[in-house]
Amino acid sequence: MENWREISEDIVSSLLEDGSDPEILYEVEHHFVCEDFPKLEQAALAAFKLGYDVEEPAELELEDGAKIWSFDIVVESELDVDVIMEDVDKLAALAVECEVEYDGWGTYFQE
């Protein structure tokens, strides 16, 4: 299992060091992937039922030509590791339960 806290701390500190505004809300995108579309769909539905804003699934092509399904969950959040980790912990557990992969999160620099 990934060390999501350490990864989250690195992302947040990098954004803040680059001058991103710590006082505004950010759109945090949580990424999910799976080769099995029905499992991915089940995870998306479960996240929606928990109140998350679920984006439409998309089929992606990997570098080796293989196909994989993905979707994102978008959450407005402070740029705060503890706040973000609340969602990471819930969503990573949901991914395990639904047998899909939680592929981390990201956001964009904001001035």
Curated annotation (Swiss-Prot):
Complex formation: Interacts with the C-terminal region of Rne.
Keyword Cytoplasm applies: yes
Subcellular location: Cytoplasm
Function: Globally modulates RNA abundance by binding to RNase E (Rne) and regulating its endonucleolytic activity. Can modulate Rne action in a substrate-dependent manner by altering the composition of the degradosome.
tRNA processing keyword on record: no
Major location (coarse): cytoplasm
Annotated InterPro entries: RraB (IPR016716), RraB-like_sf (IPR036701), RraB_dom (IPR009671)
Protein known as: Regulator of ribonuclease activity B
Molecular function in Gene Ontology: endoribonuclease inhibitor activity; enzyme binding
One GO cellular component term noted in the UniProt record for this chain: cytoplasm
Alphabetic keyword roster: Cytoplasm
Assigned protein family: Belongs to the RraB family.
Database matches in Pfam families: RraB (PF06877)
Domain of life from the UniProt record: Bacteria
